[in-house]
Every structure is written in C-alpha cells, then in structure tokens.
Amino acid sequence: ASFIKLAQVLATRADFFTLDYLEELKSLHDKLPPMSHEEFERVYAEAFHGVNFEQFKQEPIASASIGQVHVAYFEGQKLAVKLRRYNIQAQVKADIAIISFFNRLFRPLFSHYTKNSIEAVIIEFSKMILQEVNMSTELHNLQKFSSIYPTSGIKFPTPLVGLCSEHALVMSFEEGFRF
C-alpha cells in the first residue's frame, strides 16, 4: 500500500521523472482491488460494533491504498463510509522501513541534490502516510477545511462524528466529480 502511495506522491515530481514515467505513476490512483470479504468483516466489526446501519453496501465504490469507500444508510441518510484497510498501520510501518533501507542502500549512487531531495520526500511521505492511516486525522482535516471555507461555494461532506473512529470516517454522501 505504501509503495503505491509513494508512487502517487512521486507522480507529482517532474524533477525526478520524465513525463512518460509520471503518466504511468499517475495511473496508480485508486487501482487497488478491494479488501477480501474476511478482511472487510474484521474491519467493519472493529469500526462499528453495536452500530446498526439500515443498509451497508459491501461492494466499495472506490478502493485505494489506505482504505475503501462504501455507501451506507443510517437514519434515512445516504452516507459515504471510508474504511481503512485491514492491518494497514503495521503494513505502512514495515513499508517505511523497507523504503528507508533502499534509500540508504542506493544513496551513494545519487547526486548531492537528488540525495537530499529524495531524503526529504521520504521523510515527509513517512509522516504523511502515518497520519493518513488514522481516519481520526481525516475527520479532523475535514472539520478544519469545512470551518475555514464555509462560504467558498465548495460542498464539504458532513461527518457523523459519533460513528467515526481511527478505523472509519462516516460522512454525508456528496455527488461530485474527480479532478
């Protein structure tokens, strides 16, 4: 999961790769298969013990490196539910260790500027992805952006805070487009 996320980050760095490589890296957005049924059941049980959704669609509408998004209904409201992948925190920590190892291994082969640039990307990436695997961080960010831009004309989803946790972000379902 972390390697796909790193590729997504690197896809924004024209100083590292040619346009051909950047296009290939960009194609990795949201291309992961969904969790297995067993993994989904474990994550769902951990996130929602005691919560009774009127309906919860097990087939995700999106599946990415950190989590997947499902449609659910609660008290008559259509919701988007982002569940983090099973065991993702441990996976991410192991991935960071591997990425750091390879960076140390290949560091002598890079120019001075590239060494420092790659090092900075890895450090920033490690911080970012460790925060991103916690859905409580996403909840906080959603609330922060909503409060900063209340009159921007941008429709932010409304979180159902009582249903959110480090495992799941539950919010109103908003139609939109991807850019």
Task: State the predicted function of each range.
Residues 1-179:
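Broad phosphate/nucleotide-binding scaffolds in NTP-utilizing and phosphate-metabolizing enzymes
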